[in-house]
């Protein structure tokens, strides 16, 4: 019975069925997906980023960056051209909201193309430029993403 990642209704009983083979299609051990350098470089040529708002010592893309310790959500991003590849977990909506509220700066985001989410409809759709990426992004150190991606540009 442990072969699939969904619930099957069997009369009044529900069997939880999981698959080790397919779990990677839907979950990850970490919400962090390191930006591919070539994708960042292409966007940096266009936007000239000065700040990476969601980074670590190992994967920051700009010389100025905020890590977990600095808590990018509590920092001021205004007046700067920002790169944002946030953790893709439950907190992603907070990051997208903050990016959408930027004043006097630009925030370019690499995000999962989850067009069915509240954060997409509340902060992105009709309010930002969206560039859907063809195919699946190959994240540094992880291989192809199990989800489609998009670039979202907040440029008030």
Language-model segments: residues:
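Class I S-adenosyl-L-methionine-dependent methyltransferase catalytic core
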Residues: 4-156
């Amino acid at each position: 019975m442990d072969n699939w990642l969904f619930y099957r209704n069997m009369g009044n009983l529900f069997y939880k069925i999981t698959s080790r083979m397919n779990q990677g299609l839907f979950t990850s051990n970490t919400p962090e997906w390191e930006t591919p350098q070539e994708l960042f470089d292409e966007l940096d040529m266009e936007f000239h980023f000065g700040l990476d708002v969601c980074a670590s010592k190992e994967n920051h893309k700009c010389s100025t960056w905020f890590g977990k310790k600095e808590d990018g959500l509590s920092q001021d991003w205004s007046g700067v051209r920002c790169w944002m590849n946030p953790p893709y977990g439950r907190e992603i909506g907070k990051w997208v909201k903050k990016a959408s509220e930027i004043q006097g700066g630009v925030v370019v985001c690499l995000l999962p193309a989850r067009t069915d989410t509240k954060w997409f409809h509340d902060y992105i759709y009709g309010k930002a430029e969206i560039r859907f990426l063809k195919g699946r992004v190959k994240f540094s150190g992880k291989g192809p993403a199990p989800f489609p991606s998009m670039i979202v540009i907040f440029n008030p």
